[in-house]
Amino acid sequence: LAVFLAAAAMVGLTFGQLEAADKYTLRIGTSQTDQAFITRAYMTLADRLMEKSGGRLEVKVFPAGQLGGDEDILEQAIQGAPVAVNTDAGRTSAYVKETGILMMAYFADNYDECLKVTQTETFKKWEQDLATKHGIRVLAFNFYDGPRHFMTNKPINTPADLKGQRIRTIGSEVCVESIAAMGATPVSMSWGEVYNGIQSKALDGCEAQNTSTYPSKIYEVAKYQSKTGHFQLMQALLCGEVWFQSLPQDLQQLLLDTAREVGAETAAQLVAASEESEKAMVEAGLTVIEPDTTPFKEAVKPAYDKLGFTALREQLYKEIGKTK
């Protein structure tokens, strides 16, 4: 019996050593700078996963487009590469169109409304479709980077002021149609090129959130901010379903739980971070304008009709108990 127990113990030790030796690495790519709010959130996630997994799951964060554009990273993830991308509903709409409504102008008024939408059975079904039909695993859809505003070199008080203005926006159909409906000429280019684009006058401005415009120093080349808050930027962390299923079940659950945990924590910190960024930009010379947003909201209504989102918007409002 003693010999059997000793042998069993040796076998158990061997399997334990093999299990401990199974280490996994995930690379997260983002277009934002290393000082951006969302990048620092993913660095927090990396540290926490390393600690909680006992070193079995290592996450490395690559800012400033080091892994390529969002679409390129997502395609790599779908093919099975151990990569994840920080992105938004505009990108996921290329696979499941309906998810894009979360990134339509003036769809939601704040983070809480966006979060409620992601918790509906309708949205959960879309996430399942991303996984089963397109090979995309949503690790978390509750990261938040705040409302987006126009950054330009002329005051924007009404949609008419946007006419003829070449404004950089996210290169997804929902964003392009929203910005066009408000009167601007939407231009798609990587975030890392925006500063030079405005400086060289290839762009007249951009639309983005404070926690990106400040670390990217957009206020140096765009002197006005119009606080339209047209997009509420919910951020998603996406990886490939193939890679996700290659993880042991305990690490799968740990990754999901921790990503959502950090997403919720950082969302709670966003308001203060956004206000600090705005204050710093104003101190550097930025002029902030707070226009009446009613004309902008009216202007984007045709975009909902054009994309077939009007009925879907009403359905989701009903699901989350939102009144117009």
Predicted regions and their residues:
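Short, low-complexity disordered leader/linker segments with a strong preference
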Residues: 1-25, 324
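N-terminal secretory/targeting leader peptides
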Residues: 20-114, 122-124, 128-324
